[in-house]
Amino acid sequence: MVKLLGQLLEEAYPNFVEKNLSYDLQSNVPVKIITADGNLLARLFDNLIGNAIKYGADGKRVLVKILAQEDVVTVSITNYGYVIPPEELPLIFNKFYRVEQSRSSSTGGTGLGLAIAKEIVDMHGGTINVTSDLDGTVFTVKLQVNFDINKENFGTIS
């Protein structure tokens, strides 16, 4: 998990530079292996990191934290830019939903990224939550370390 997130952050480095952002990856362990579909998790975290960059404030940072426990890994991605209004938080994982103030041509997007992210987390038996206030917007993903990957869990991502 640490390696995957580190690689995704490195790949996104040009985007960080373009937005005048920095990033910080923190983990309580140097390595954590979980049973999961690596391609889907890469898609999930690439989306969350991309959104943190897109909506991050110029000159601020994106903080990625990994908290590994015996049977659960928690990943939080925080940006210190745009605050999502509280009334919009319950809707943010709906397909085609875009936060009203982010619907500009400069940010782009279809409103599918977070819906797909939630489907990926659900397929892995995990949870995804968001909080947003003046202290930052935080997406928190919790995944089981030893998830039973079988065909019933993995369907088509719509």
Where are the predicted features?
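Short alpha-helical Gxxx[C/S/T] motif in the catalytic ATP-binding
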Residues: 108, 113, 117
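Short helix-loop "hinge" at the ATP-lid/N-box region of the Bergerat-fold HATPase_c
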Residues: 52-53
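Short beta-strand/loop element within the Bergerat-fold HATPase_c
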Residues: 59-71
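Conserved glycine-rich
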Residues: 125-126
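Conserved catalytic submotifs in the C-terminal HATPase_c
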Residues: 22-32
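A conserved beta-strand-to-alpha-helix junction within the catalytic ATP-binding
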Residues: 1-10, 24
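Short conserved segment of the HATPase_c
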Residues: 84-96, 155
